C-alpha cells in the first residue's frame, strides 16, 4: 500500500476518533476512548512490576491485588503473571474495549499483552510484541494510549544512539504495526523542538493531542547519582510539550516547558479545556491553555515543595471534577494535594509523607481511594533501607489520607512496583455473588 493510501485511511480513522463518544476510565488519567467506566468500587489493582535479581523469579510481572473491602482477600496479592525476563517494566495501558492491558519494557522494548477482560482477577499473558525497534526505529515504549481499535505508543528513545530523540508508534489492537510519527526536532510556531517523548494526552473536543518529554535510554538506564553529577547528561532532558492536530497527526505548536515535563492531565469536567503537567527537574506545575485567538500556551503556575532540594515530582493524578491534583515527589517521599479550583493559581492544601521513596499515584473515580507505589526506575531507586518497595492504599475524606492497607513487594518476593491499573468484576458476576451472600 502506498503512502497516500495509508495517509488517506489514517485521516479517516482519526476523523472517527474525534467524532467518537468518550468515557473516561476509572483512574482519571486514562484515554477518553476507554469503555467500561468504573464509577463505584474497583475490585482489583494490577501492578506492572520490575523484576529484581535474586528476588523471587527475578522477572518482570503483572501482580494482581484484591482491593475490594468486602472481599475475604482484601489487601492481598491474589496472583502474578511473570513474563520470563527482566526488561525494565514501567507503564501500561488498556485497549479501548478495556479487555487487554499492554505493558512495556523500557530496556528490552518488548510489549506484553495481558487479557484482563475474560477474568479480571486472573490476567493471562496472550501476546508478546517484539518488533517496535525494527518497525519504528524507536525504543523504550512508555505510554500506551487507547484509540478506537488502536494503541498509540509514546516512546522515550531510539535504537540508533539511544538518546532522547524519538516518536510515536501506532499499532492495531491485534498487535500489528501500522505507522510511526516523529516528534519534531525542527521549529514549529517559532519554537525549536527537541524530539523528546514521554506522555500522551488527547482532548477530542478540541482535536488536540499533547506529548511531553523526558530523556533517552542512555540516561534512564544509568545510575541517577551518575546522571546528576554529569553536566553533559543533564543537558539531555526534554524541555518541550508538543501540540498536535489529532486528525492529521501533525504538530501545530511546540511549547517551551523547561525541566522535563512528565505526565499530562486534561481537566475532565465538560468545557474545561485545559491541561496540567509537572516538570521533574524544576518542581513546577504548568498550565496548558488556549487563548482567545486559539493559540495554546504553557504557563508556570505553582511550585512543588522546595526546588532547591530537588524533590523530583514524578506522577500526578487529577480529580474527576478537575478541582484537585495529587503529586508525588520521589526523593522526599511526599504525596501532595493541590486545590485546582483556579487552575491559574493552584494551592497546596495537604501533604503527607507516604514512603522513603514514592512514585506512582492513582485514585478511584469518586476520589475516595488513593494508591501509591514506590519504584521509579531500577537504576534510579534508592538503596539500602531507603529502597522501600511497596503499594500503599489510603482513604481520602477531602482533608486527610488514612491508611487502608499496604503490600510489601520485597517481603512478597515480587520486585519493584510501578504502574497501576484498575479492573472490576463483570456486573453479572457481582450480582450473583451478592445473591449468594
Indicate where each model-derived feature is located.
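A short beta-strand motif characteristic of beta-propeller blades
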Residues: 77-83, 124-134, 177-190, 250-255, ...
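Beta-propeller domains
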Residues: 95, 190-342
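Asp-box/WD-like beta-propeller blade repeats and closely related beta-sheet repeat scaffolds
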Residues: 116-204
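Beta-rich, blade/repeat-based domains predominating
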Residues: 28-36, 57, 84-96, 133-149, ...
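Blade-loop segments of beta-propeller domains
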Residues: 74-146
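Beta-strand-rich domains and repeat architectures in extracellular enzymes and scaffolds
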Residues: 26-67, 73-106
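Short, conserved, GDST-rich strand-edge loop motifs in beta-rich repeat architectures
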Residues: 34-57, 154-165, 212-236, 373-391
Amino acid at each position: 500500500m502506498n503512502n497516500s493510501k495509508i495517509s488517506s485511511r489514517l485521516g479517516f480513522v482519526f476523523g472517527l476518533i474525534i467524532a467518537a463518544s468518550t468515557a473516561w476510565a476509572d483512574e482519571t488519567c486514562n484515554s477518553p476512548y476507554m469503555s467500561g467506566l468504573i464509577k463505584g468500587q474497583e475490585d482489583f489493582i494490577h501492578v506492572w512490576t520490575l523484576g529484581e535479581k535474586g528476588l523471587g523469579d527475578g522477572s518482570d510481572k503483572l501482580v494482581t491485588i484484591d482491593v475490594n473491602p468486602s472481599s475475604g482477600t482484601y489487601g492481598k496479592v491474589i496472583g502474578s503473571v511473570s513474563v520470563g525476563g527482566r526488561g525494565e517494566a514501567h507503564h501500561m495501558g488498556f485497549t479501548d474495549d478495556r479487555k487487554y492491558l499492554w505493558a512495556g519494557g523500557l530496556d528490552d522494548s518488548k510489549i506484553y499483552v495481558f487479557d484482563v477482560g475474560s477474568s479480571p482477577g486472573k490476567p493471562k499473558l496472550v501476546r508478546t510484541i517484539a518488533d517496535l525497534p525494527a518497525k519504528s526505529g524507536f525504543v523504550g515504549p512508555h505510554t500506551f494510549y487507547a484509540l478506537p481499535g488502536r494503541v498509540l505508543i509514546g516512546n522515550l528513545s531510539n535504537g540508533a544512539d539511544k538518546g532522547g530523540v524519538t516518536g510515536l508508534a501506532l499499532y492495531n489492537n491485534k498487535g500489528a504495526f501500522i505507522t510511526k510519527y516523529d516528534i519534531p526536532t525542527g521549529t514549529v510556531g517559532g519554537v525549536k523542538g527537541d524530539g523528546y517523548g514521554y506522555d500522551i494526552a488527547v482532548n477530542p473536543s478540541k482535536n488536540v493531542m499533547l506529548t511531553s518529554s523526558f530523556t533517552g535510554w542512555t540516561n534512564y538506564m544509568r545510575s541517577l547519582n551518575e546522571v546528576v553529577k554529569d553536566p553533559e547528561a543533564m543537558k539531555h532532558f526534554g524541555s518541550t510539550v508538543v501540540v498536535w492536530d489529532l486528525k492529521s497527526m501533525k504538530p501545530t505548536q511546540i511549547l517551551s516547558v523547561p525541566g522535563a515535563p512528565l505526565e499530562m492531565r486534561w481537566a475532565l469536567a465538560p468545557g474545561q479545556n485545559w491541561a496540567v503537567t509537572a516538570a521533574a527537574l524544576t518542581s513546577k506545575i504548568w498550565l496548558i491553555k488556549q487563548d482567545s485567538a486559539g493559540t495554546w500556551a504553557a504557563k508556570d503556575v505553582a511550585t512543588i515543595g522546595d526546588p532547591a532540594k530537588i524533590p523530583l515530582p514524578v506522577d500526578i493524578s487529577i480529580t474527576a471534577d478537575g478541582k484537585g491534583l495529587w503529586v508525588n515527589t520521589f526523593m522526599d517521599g511526599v504525596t501532595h494535594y493541590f486545590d485546582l479550583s483556579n487552575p491559574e493559581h493552584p494551592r497546596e492544601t495537604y501533604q503527607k509523607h507516604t514512603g522513603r521513596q514514592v512514585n506512582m499515584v492513582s485514585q478511584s473515580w469518586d476520589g475516595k481511594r488513593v494508591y501509591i507505589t514506590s519504584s521509579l526506575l531500577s537504576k534510579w531507586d534508592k538503596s539500602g533501607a531507603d529502597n522501600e518497595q511497596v503499594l500503599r492504599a489510603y482513604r481520602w475524606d477531602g482533608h486527610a489520607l488514612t491508611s487502608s492497607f499496604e503490600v510489601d513487594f520485597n517481603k512478597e518476593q515480587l520486585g519493584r512496583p510501578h504502574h497501576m491499573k484498575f479492573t472490576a468484576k463483570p456486573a453479572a458476576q457481582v450480582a450473583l455473588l451478592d445473591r449468594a451472600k
